[in-house]
From Swiss-Prot:
HAMAP family: ATP_synth_b_bprime (MF_01398). A lipid is attached at C26 (N-palmitoyl cysteine). It holds the Pfam family ATP-synt_B. This is ATP synthase subunit b. The gene is atpF. It is a single-pass membrane protein. It comes from Mycoplasmoides gallisepticum (strain R(low / passage 15 / clone 2)). A lipid is attached at C26 (S-diacylglycerol cysteine).
Amino acid sequence: MWSTRVKKLLLLSFNFLIISAIVSSCSIPEELQAKTIVNEFFPNFWVFVAHTIALSIIILLGIFLLWKPTKRFLAKRSELIQAEINNANEIKKQAQFLLDNAKKQKQNAELQAREIINLATNQAYRLKNDLETDAKRKANRIIENAHAEIIKQESILKRELEGRIVDVALEATSTLIQKNVAKEDHERLVNELLRNLD
């Protein structure tokens, strides 16, 4: 785009130079005559050759001093821009690669977090069940021990009660023997003893 624009500008400036050189070499006299118009308006051959050589030199200088350095500069600039574009594309690929890796790592981390949460939840449920089972076992053991203690205490109380009953019966028998009590008195005495036991 720049090269065509530069070429057009160079051609336009060279055309302007040619026209100005031709016009400047001609002088219009004060008196215009047919002979003088042709001779004065159009330059003679040597002037034309000198102007053509000068124009050629100017064109060559323009090509070598303006157009070629500009073309080289634009080519270098184009290469630099292309290198920057390639570099940017490479950086973009690397960034995309890193982004993909980061996404994979994030997914792996989320998966590991879910697994850890599930494992912790399962361990918590297992621990809860173990604690409940242990607590039930201890409670059952305490209840069994309490039942055993109750049975033991009952048997002790029964033995004591039986011992008392025997003592009371012996006492009653000895009292009956001593008193020769009537049947009604005997029943009343037994009922009294039973009330005392309660």
